[in-house]
Each structure stands twice: as structure tokens, then as C-alpha cells.
Amino acid sequence: MKETFQVGIIGFGDMGRLYAEYISKAGWRVNVCDRPENYESIQATYGNGGYTVLKDGFQVSRTSDYILYSVEAEHIDKVVALYGPATKVGAIVGGQTSCKAPEMNAFEKYLPEDVDIISCHSMHGPKVNPKSQPLVIIRHRASDEHFEIVNEILSCFKSSVVYLSAKEHDRITADTQAVTHAAFLTMGLAWHANNQYPWEINRWCGGIENIKMNLSMRIYSSKWHVYAGLAILNPEAQRQIQQYASSVTELFKLAISGKAKEYEDRIRNAGKFVFGENMDRNSSGLLLSDELLDQYSISNIPKDESKRNSHLSILAIVDSWSKLGIHPQNHMICSTPLFRLWVGVSEYVFRHPGLLDSCIYTATKHNDFSPDDLEFVVAVRSWSECVAAKDFTTYKKRFLETQEYFRPRFEEATRVGNAMISKLLENLQKM
């Protein structure tokens, strides 16, 4: 079958290239294209990459037996409207967008009725090895034969396959990604607004701070549209980002109004809801320790010079999970590396009473960190308002400005972050 069956990929961005490389190396014939104006440059760079570079989506659609749309969620409707009607008779079509509602709507509107629909979503970025990472496969409408073929094609990633409906995918994706991304995007925006490089300041060095910095830089070194599409086009994601902004704001107001007891009760009750009454059990499966986290630092400041931190970003995410009735550990089977790390970090704070006590004390009794927390409040509310207004233009502008501010440290942060993620997930897999 591999000699005659052709896989087509429309959209040759980072994930499109990842799919083309893995599928072609597995022996399948692969056709790829990007925007027509990019044809010559892609042909010159990747023409000998083991797959065929075609001029546009019409050629890919007419010749391929399984066509994957690897385009931004914001543009999926107009791209499928353009190329969908040209789909080969009896072919299979799918997409890789992180939000499936607009993708499925486009497929149902523009694809011929004789075309089967089987979508997928690799729950990781292009810089992560797909082996053992969650891969969602969505059988929207398909024969058993076509379903088996798609499973065989995607088996080349050696990922952990999860079968979901499009609706289930969007709900779980919101649960596992929306607030996680919002937290790290907000950190970067707040640091930028304060004109701070956190690795140069003793407020942010050692242990948990390394995860915050590395993962925030990791997100800002990626493509803006990856995060914008998931946040703006997924209704569940919008609701969760709004709740996170509310949790951040309400906790900050309690902290600065002298309501320390109310603040502490709210935090501890949220922790009990999310992680259970018995905090001795490690539900995330991540074996975190200060010694391990200290190995992955991009800061030159000695740990013993670090200062207390309120960890508002972490306490607020647990509070928002509690308010939304979310138990994050229930979604570990189809979660991203970022989400697993963030759940692990959050649980680490709550499972170490001394650390949690320090966070509460710093927020309510120690005003030195209040200006930084205020900047975080302003940043998270600005992201939330942008998402609620479905404002892609402002989202892109804020993201790219912050990205440019931190660009000099991306290479080092990516290298250190990759090593950190690999080590921590290795510990997870050993359990």
C-alpha cells in the first residue's frame, strides 16, 4: 500500500514539516505545499527531503489519498473552502488544528460527501520528540478500512494514541492547555512591562523559578497563532482564561486588603479540592525536587540569594481549577508536557507545607512582592480581555512585542528547557 497510497499535507509550518518528515521516513509517499508564493523557497530548501513539494493545495488535494490540513485555526475555514472541493474522490481528510470545532465545521461545509473525515492532534510542539506523547485521533466520519489506514500512518510517531470526539477534544484541550498557556504568557508580559529579565533578579532564581522562566521562554519562542487559536476559538478555553484572570485579581485584592485569613482559607480549600484531603499522595506522577530543578537554570544568581515569592501564578491556577470543578490529574492521558509540568509544580507547592506557608505569608504580610503581583494582575486581565473580544490583532501584537524583548535568551532557554522537560518526563515514565 505504501507504494501507491499518498499522504498530502497542506500547510508547511513547523508541525507540517514534523509530520512530513516522520511519515515519509516511515515509507509513505508524501506531498506537501504551503502558500503558492512560498513554493520556490520550499522547493529549494526541502525538495530533496524525501517528499514531493507541490505548488498549492489544489495539487495536493487532487493527488493525495489522506490530506491533512496543517494551517492556523484562524484560517482553517477559508483554506478548506478554497481547496476542499478539489479533494480526490473517496479520499480521507483531517486536520491538525488545536481547536476542532471550526475545523469540523469547515470540513462539513466544503468537503464532498464521498470524503471521509479523520482528524488528529499531536499534544506537543514541534520541538518535542513525539514518542510516548499523547496523540488524539478523531473519527468524525469514516469506514473501518480508512480508520485502520490512518492509524497505520500515524503509528510512525510512536505516540500514545487517545480516541476522542471533536467535542471531547476541545473540552479536554481547554482543561489542559488554556490556563497553562495563559499563565506563562502573563509572566512574560508582566516581566516585559516591568522591563525585567527575571534571570537577572534574585526574586526569580532557583527551584520552581527555573520552570517558570524556561517554560515562559519556550512559549514565546514559538508561533503566536498556536496559542491564539486555542484561546480565542475554543469557547471552553475562553471561559477558563476568564476564570484564571478572576482568580488572580480576587486573590491579589484579598492579599493587599489585609484579609490574610480569607486568603489562606481560599488557597487551602482550593488545594484540597484539586489534590485531595491527603496531600501525601502524588497524583501528578512528577518527582520534583529542588535539587533536580536547580540543575536547569538560566540565571547566574546563587540560590542562597533568592527572595521569597508569593507564587500568585501558581496559587491562582489551583484556585481557578477549583472554581471550575476541574481535577487536572484526570486528563493526564492526553496532556501536553507543559501541562504535566505545571500540574507537578502546583502540586509540589501544595504538598510542601513550608513552601505553601511562605507563599501565603509573602502575599499577605510581605509587601515587597506586591508591585510584581500587581503587574501580573494587569497582564492577565489584558490577555483575558483580548481573548474575550476575539481580538487576534491585539493578541499578535502583544505576543510579538514580548517575543522580541526576550529573543536574545531563546536559544539558551530552549536548550535548558528541553533538557529539563526530558528529565522530568523521564521520571514520570519510570513511575
UniProtKB/Swiss-Prot annotation:
Record domain Prephenate/arogenate dehydrogenase: where: 5-285
GO cellular component, one term: cytosol
MF terms in GO: NAD+ binding; NADP binding; prephenate dehydrogenase (NAD+) activity; prephenate dehydrogenase (NADP+) activity
Residues bound to NADP(+): 5-34
Domain of life (superkingdom): Eukaryota
InterPro entries, per the entry: 6-PGluconate_DH-like_C_sf (IPR008927), 6PGDH_NADP-bd (IPR006115), NAD(P)-bd_dom_sf (IPR036291), Preph/Arog_dehydrog (IPR050812), Prephen_DH (IPR003099), Prephenate_DH_fun (IPR012385)
EC number per UniProt: 1.3.1.13
This protein's UniProt keywords: Amino-acid biosynthesis, Aromatic amino acid biosynthesis, Cytoplasm, NADP, Oxidoreductase, Tyrosine biosynthesis
GO terms classed as biological process: tyrosine biosynthetic process
Keyword Oxidoreductase part of the UniProt annotation: yes
Subcellular location, principal: cytoplasm
Pathway listed: Amino-acid biosynthesis; L-tyrosine biosynthesis; (4-hydroxyphenyl)pyruvate from prephenate (NADP(+) route): step 1/1
Stretches assigned to coiled coil: none
Catalytic activity: prephenate + NADP(+) = 3-(4-hydroxyphenyl)pyruvate + CO2 + NADPH
Family: Belongs to the prephenate/arogenate dehydrogenase family.
Record protein name field: Probable prephenate dehydrogenase [NADP(+)]
